[in-house]
Amino acid sequence: MSTINTDTNETMPHISVNAQYIKDLSLENPSAPSSLAALDQRPQIDLSLDINITNLSEESFYEVELNIEAIARNEKYKLFQVELKYAGVFNLINIDSEQHPVLLSVHCPAMIFPFARKIIASCTQDAGFQPLMIDPIDFGALYHKKMSEHQN
C-alpha cells in the first residue's frame, strides 16, 4: 500500500479546478420542422471560439470562459445556431505568475473543452440533428497565433 505525502503536494505547483458551469446557452432551430426534413446532405458549419480570462481575486483564482458559436446551414436553410459560454474557476497554486498567461490560455481551456463539446453535441441532437462533434482544438496553436498577432 502506498501513502501520499500531502505536505509535499501542498507545495508542488498545480492547477485546481474549483468549479465548472454553463454561463449561457442558446440554441435556435429557426426553420424547423422544414429543416429537419432537408438533412440529406452534410451542412456547412461555421464555428467560432473565444476565450475570456478574468482574475477573480488578488490570489491566483481565475475564471476561464469558452465562448463557442456554431451555425449550421445547407443550401435552403439556416439549420441551427448554438451559442455556449462555458466556464471554469481555476486556482493556480504555487505557480510563478509569469506562467499564468500560457496556463490560463492553453491548459485551462483544454481541461474544460471536452465538457463544452459534450453540451453542444447534446443540444444539437436534442434539436433533431446529428450531434455536432466539434474537432479537438489546439489551444497552444491559438495562443501562439494570438501572441504573434499582438507583436505585429
Swiss-Prot record:
Top-level lineage group: Bacteria
Biological process according to GO: protein folding; protein tetramerization; protein transport
Entry annotated with the keyword Transferase: no
Compartments where located: Cytoplasm
Keyword presence, Cytoplasm: yes
Keywords: Chaperone, Cytoplasm, Protein transport, Translocation, Transport
A GO-annotated cellular component: cytoplasm
Any one GO molecular function term: unfolded protein binding
Entry-linked Pfam families: SecB (PF02556)
Family: Belongs to the SecB family.
Function: One of the proteins required for the normal export of preproteins out of the cell cytoplasm. It is a molecular chaperone that binds to a subset of precursor proteins, maintaining them in a translocation-competent state. It also specifically binds to its receptor SecA.
Subunit composition and interactions: Homotetramer, a dimer of dimers. One homotetramer interacts with 1 SecA dimer.
Protein name: Protein-export protein SecB
Source organism (scientific name): Rickettsia rickettsii (strain Sheila Smith)
UniProt lineage: Bacteria, Pseudomonadati, Pseudomonadota, Alphaproteobacteria, Rickettsiales
